Amino acid sequence: MLISYHWLFALTHTNFSAAEAKERLTMVGLAIDALEAQGQDFVLDVEVPSNRPDCLSHVGIARELTVIENGRLYLPAPEPIKTEGRSAVLTSVEIKDQDLCPRYAARIIRGVKIGPSPDWLANQLETIGQRPINNVADITNYVLHELGQPLHAFDFAKLGGQRIVVRRAAPGEKLTTLDGVERTLTADMLVIADAEKPVALAGIMGGEESEISDQTTDVLIESAYFDPHSVRQTARQLGMDTEASRRFERGADCEGVLRAQQRCVELICQMAGGVATEDAIDVYPRPFSERVISLRPERIPALTSLVVAPDEIRRILVGLGFQPVAENSFKVPSWRIDVEQEEDLVEEVARHTGYDKIRSELPPSNSSGEYQPREMKQRSLRRALNACGFDEAISFSFIQQDTRFELIPSLIGHENDQPQLANPIIEDAAWMRSTLLPGLLSSVRHNLNHGIRDVRLFEIGRIFTIFKAGELPHETLALGIVATGGALEENRAQAERELDFFDLKGALEAAVDSMNLSPLTFTQTSARHLRVGQSALIKSGNGTAIGTIGRLAESVATSYKFRQPLYILELDLGALLDGPEKLIQYSPLPRYPSVTRDISLLVNREVALADIYTVVHNQQVSDCRDVKLVGTFEGGNIPASKRSVTLRLEYRSDERTLRDEEVEAYHSRLTSALLDTFAAEQR
């Protein structure tokens, strides 16, 4: 924003030069990007923080400068003007949507003479990059840059029915704005209308049909407060960015509406003649609610290490417009929408005391730096997944609302309670994520688009849901893993095969084992984002359901344009880390050789591998040391309801070398148990 140094001087009588003002304002958080000479004046290009709309005016910057210099603010004194009649006799104002327009004031000036602005006004506007138009339009622009309140002047004779209606636009309604562009409006856009048609886009730009012209004699001055979100949304949809919209979408001063209008009316009467009505029609259905905040002096050194005298605290806050109402309590001015709590007052004092005076201190610590147990487990988890070929991803926490994915078990029932941002930076990312999967799948899609077919990713991050209305979102630490492509690198001797469910399951089990946690169990389940028959519920060592794993459902895969199988899992990592740890037992290295035997079974497709393992372990064959899955096969000559499962069993004794007949006896016993339990066939 461009600020005139001479204009600042008129408001502050500052002793600072333009260069000194630039330096001092930068030190209180109002960075000056550039300082340039403009004739006899200097122009400061101020980078105003997004939460400080009060500084989008010369008075706002001047207020900061007076506190820095311990000076005072010299606001223009009210000027007497000629008035006659009441506004309510000549016009009326109706607000049909009070949520989007909490306040609207209208005042009429009759008998004005439109012409060029005085040289001082035209030069002042040109200094800050504004093109002079005519005296009335220039005065509204001048007051906007002086006080920060956008205003608009209508040709009163061109208003149908001589009235103002603040309403939403009708779908498809047309309005030609002052830039000559015909715009098609939607039902969520707020307009200023007369009795017949829209005449302005609320808070953005006026309409061409009600524009001030050389023939104008009567004007209606609008001063209002519009909902920031509504103005921002409309401006973005229409691709518009105006001086008015920049201020309204950040938050204007709803209590400054009449003050700015009065200033505008005085200047018009002085420069364009005319007689103003005695008062304004001020429709204010939802008055400003004052905020009072207490500031404990001891909080300032506690938060900033700055020691500030009580008198200095009071001087700074009063200079910034805060009114003391008790010893340590202050009323927040209406233009400071960013101040909501005690810490905000501490920040104001710290800014003007000097951030450079804050001492560098290490935070207090009662012990040497070390990782906490949960952090150690997460480090082990990351290392294990890296060793399995997975890369860690970090995706955006703000996403589009997405109900394609079933939440992890602890959050089921809250699918419709995904937190929505009140002020999203990006319209397509207006929701806080309740699952990690959309971000991971988008990363997979990005890799596939760039020719990378083999993708293995995991993410550790927080997901958000609302359990009770009115409460803050509940945060859950989650783990998401996705895998697709080949299971082996192309330069290996063994032929490449496709990743499958068991590769992903094995990687998870290896990661859990690295954290010294009790083994997980898997039971067949169904989830809307997973393929039927290829999904499982993940349970921690204490039997708590913590997540799901499986192949991505065709409907979801199609929406992402995946043409190859993709396997995913998501679980509640916090619940997993809180699960029971396994008891570590040490044993000597085996002294005797082991013997392996394979067995291939034809089982029903619904038989879970975990159930097969359970049967083997329940036989209590002490010399059966391990059972592993070699592979599964479906299709071909195998019936559609069946699948082939090949297991490898390892036998070994700690006392001697097993004889062939002993191994065969063990193997026959386990084979019979599996055949009988699952009505299986041996292949």
Residue ranges and their predicted role:
Residues 30-36, 69-76, 131-136, 321-327, ...:
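Short, well-structured beta-strand/strand-turn elements
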Residues 10, 110, 126-132, 246-253, ...:
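Short histidine-centered catalytic/ligand-binding loop motif
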Residues 77-89, 195-232, 262, 266, ...:
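Conserved alpha/beta core surface patches that mediate binding of polyanionic ligands
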Residues 2-5, 20-23, 319-321, 338, ...:
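A carboxyl-terminal module marker
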Residues 27, 43, 60, 64, ...:
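Extended, well-folded interaction surfaces typified by the phenylalanyl-tRNA synthetase beta subunit core
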Residues 1-374, 379-381:
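RNA/tRNA-interacting regions in translation and RNA-turnover enzymes
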Residues 43, 231, 352, 422-424, ...:
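Polyanion/phosphate-binding surface patch
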